[in-house]
């Protein structure tokens, strides 16, 4: 039986429709969520048996977009979808993050969420529909789930908040965030803006929370109609006497270990405490997992109490205290820009590489087809950064997500493409990790961009900070610059990046209900204070983008040419720009409105490249006579270069001495004097040798007149007439009809080499004389 529920989502143009009972019925729960012409199928499946030796819910989320949903055929050789794209991975993460904290403690069954885009229009993005679909599928299923939640995108367009805006509205927005929440609490935020004030972000979040209420109510109604009884899972249990002994014996040791500032030493000590307890009490092997599970819960509770009661954190810092910062700009010679940013035991080495427009990242997206990215930020966290002896594999989902977060933070400050045409690639390699590596990446990227001389907007640095929260009933403490432990054991992970003037990127995961607007504003205020402190340190290290780049950093110069002549610089198949690069080492990119960009790498001769471009666009005068060099010979004509880059065609029909094939008379490398007849549609000259005379290096034009008499030589004979060379390089036709002695075939009277006296009786439209031998 098919059942559907409909709900408005804030001030969005069209309602949300949630349908179940028609598709994918063998799953534990499945729904189709629609808005406009966009539809997403979301399924939830759970394993019957729990996974052993894990202390978390083994959740996996897989979001996929089919090209058919957009009416497209995938590109590539196979013409089928392949491994998940970055876009699919990022959407999978925003589905995963809000639902993961809502599985009950001790639930260790495999849960697989799959979202498949069935249809996609040109108005609504499927991503937020997939978040709502994941919640609805779980809510109506047997799978234990403390939802429902709903997803919404909030944008600010012309100063007004819009829920689930269209693609066109998003283009005009200065704030674009995806968020998810329960009926009364925000649980996840992901997005960014153009230096947005903290108060505006807070207002947007609570606008979004209000917008999703009807969608959550629709899910409740759906469960009332078709919901399955929830699965009774086996909870983790431990005998009371062991649990009591664990708390009494381990509490003082854990508190003492919290005072150890070094991460590796603290982790090792905490692990040793529980191992010694198990050994001392001879705990049976089947209870080892339960002991460690409750030990972790004890560790979390003690850490939280220490912060709430004493205002002191694991490493001894105050709640708003930031770890010591150490910065090194351009530590290594060859990268175009590079910097080390260290905060406590978190360290990022960030490089900037500048490239030419042909090195842009081309992404085939399902919605938009090919997209060219001029800015890329890639984040990498090798195992050695946490002291693990593991091989370094390909990027994982977490790394792709962290890179996207940092990329979003930096991008609004980049110079416009027309002012700074370089392709920019930033790479962050995490060398040490103890929390907040994505925010260290933001800081390191900003420093490295300054080092590379990238003219960031208003010379502004971008800094990031990760905030945490400990919340117990009516007490809460906000933590600045959190450690890895505080992330895992706290109630909120709130990453904020931006400039001194506002927020450019935000990511928030909240594990508890009850985050009020007051708490949110306090967290944003404390984050701003921390961000300003970090920015101060960054400006001390490098106050503005370098005016003079390093020796190995490429430079760019701009040459303006007439827009209609720009294709000449490219040349057929890019041959001209390739020639310039081969001869000068300068890469040429032809932009819009006659802008030609010269990318100068070490060893490049930019002055020579400029001269070559000036020669290419230099005007030739129609009717003028020039000396050139033959660069290519074809049967139909020869290509003559007047100066570097200025090449035109001398067609056989425009030659003073008619020939069947130009290869009979001309060779590559020969000099030739030509007259410009006209220009083709691309501005390339077309030549003739008719009516000009080569006298040494002088260019003397000869114009025969009717009545002139010449003594010439026969250079070619055809049945219809003889071609007479009446002066060096100048030929005219003696037609059989103009011969004094009438013949049917000129070959009956003349042969090549004969000397004949002729008179001009006519000048054709191309300036060539026609003769008679009746003199």
UniProtKB/Swiss-Prot annotation:
UniProt keyword terms in alphabetical order: Cytoplasm, Magnesium, Metal-binding, Nucleotidyltransferase, Repeat, RNA-binding, Transferase
Enzyme's top EC category? transferase
Entries under Pfam families matching the protein: KH_1, PNPase, RNase_PH, RNase_PH_C, S1
Residues of the S1 motif domain? 623-693, 707-775
Q: SUPFAM superfamilies, alphabetically?
A: Eukaryotic type KH-domain (KH-domain type I) (SSF54791), Nucleic acid-binding proteins (SSF50249), Polynucleotide phosphorylase/guanosine pentaphosphate synthase (PNPase/GPSI), domain 3 (SSF46915), Ribonuclease PH domain 2-like (SSF55666), Ribosomal protein S5 domain 2-like (SSF54211)
GO MF annotations in UniProt:
3'-5'-RNA exonuclease activity; magnesium ion binding; polyribonucleotide nucleotidyltransferase activity; RNA binding
Please tell me where this protein is predominantly located.
cytoplasm
Q: Which residues hold Mg(2+)?
A: 487, 493
Return the CDD domains for the record: KH-I_PNPase, RNase_PH_PNPase_1, RNase_PH_PNPase_2
Q: Which GO terms describe its cellular component?
A: cytosol
Q: What is its EC number?
A: 2.7.7.8
Q: Which reaction does it catalyse?
A: RNA(n+1) + phosphate = RNA(n) + a ribonucleoside 5'-diphosphate
All residue ranges annotated as the KH domain in the record: 554-613
Cofactors needed by this protein, per the record, are: Mg(2+)
Tell me which Gene3D superfamilies the record gives.
GHMP Kinase, N-terminal domain, K Homology domain, type 1, Nucleic acid-binding proteins
Alphabetical list of InterPro entries matching this protein: ExoRNase_PH_dom1, ExoRNase_PH_dom2, ExoRNase_PH_dom2_sf, KH_dom, KH_dom_type_1, KH_dom_type_1_sf, NA-bd_OB-fold, PNPase
Gene Ontology biological process terms, A to Z: mRNA catabolic process; RNA catabolic process; RNA processing
Where is the protein found, in the record's own terms? Cytoplasm
- What family classification does the UniProt entry report for this protein? Belongs to the polyribonucleotide nucleotidyltransferase family.
Function as written in the Swiss-Prot or TrEMBL entry: Involved in mRNA degradation. Catalyzes the phosphorolysis of single-stranded polyribonucleotides processively in the 3'- to 5'-direction.
Q: What is this protein's name?
A: Polyribonucleotide nucleotidyltransferase
Gene that codes for this? pnp
